[in-house]
């Protein structure tokens, strides 16, 4: 709170841990939950649409996911199960009216294609690291674009160029805690409080004030998850 973070979304990565995430949201008014199974999660319960919809009925659950595609560790040709899992999450999102948290790693074309084929209605491209062409395709589908602490890294100049182009009303920020700690704390454990430093960098990139960027991203968060 000292860094003006007033609310945040605690993301579910498998159904076995949903109760822990949900209980945090029940106990703390500033914390909200999602429900979903991460694309790289294995040795876990496979979600079906009906089960996701049951969990999504809680008013503390504001999103479906984390879902999406990840071909970094899994060959594309071996990932049919991952694509099918993604489609089920999109169905649950569309039916529940709760937006998706979309993970995309080394799977740009398939992620955009499936979002389009399934007529995804709302969501955010979480921890975005791709190029402008991919961002534009996601924006054209109605997605929001969220930037993490990666935006502050010295190696992230191409990503900062993308961040300049995103329409202000589609920008979101995150930490992807406990990973990807932003500068100047890189190498240390991450914290939701460090969202401030992502906002700070985004304001610098877009030549605006920190207060203005915080107001914009807060408004966008409320628009996506609470409208």
Enumerate the language-model features and the residues they cover.
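Mid-domain alpha/beta scaffold segments of enzyme catalytic cores
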Residues: 1-227
């Amino acid at each position: 709170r000292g860094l003006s973070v007033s609310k945040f979304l605690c993301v579910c990565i498998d159904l076995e841990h949903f109760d822990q995430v949900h209980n945090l949201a029940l106990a703390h008014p500033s914390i909200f939950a999602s429900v979903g199974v991460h694309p790289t999660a294995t040795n876990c319960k496979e979600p079906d649409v009906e089960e996701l919809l049951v969990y999504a009925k809680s008013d503390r659950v504001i999103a479906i996911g984390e879902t999406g595609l990840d071909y970094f560790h899994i060959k594309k040709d071996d990932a049919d199960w991952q694509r099918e899992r993604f489609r089920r999450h999109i169905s649950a999102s569309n039916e529940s009216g709760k937006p998706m948290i979309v993970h995309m790693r080394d799977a740009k074309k398939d992620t955009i294609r499936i979002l389009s084929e399934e007529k995804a209605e709302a969501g955010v491209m979480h921890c975005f690291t791709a190029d402008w062409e991919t961002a534009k395709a996601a924006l054209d589908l109605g997605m929001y674009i969220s930037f993490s602490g990666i935006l502050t890294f010295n190696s992230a100049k191409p990503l900062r160029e993308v961040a300049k182009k995103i329409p202000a009303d589609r920008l979101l920020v995150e930490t992807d805690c406990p990973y990807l700690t932003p500068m100047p704390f890189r190498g240390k454990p991450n914290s939701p409080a460090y969202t401030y430093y992502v906002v700070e960098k985004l304001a610098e990139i877009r030549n605006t004030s920190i207060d203005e960027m915080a107001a914009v991203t807060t408004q966008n968060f409320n628009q996506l998850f609470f409208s």
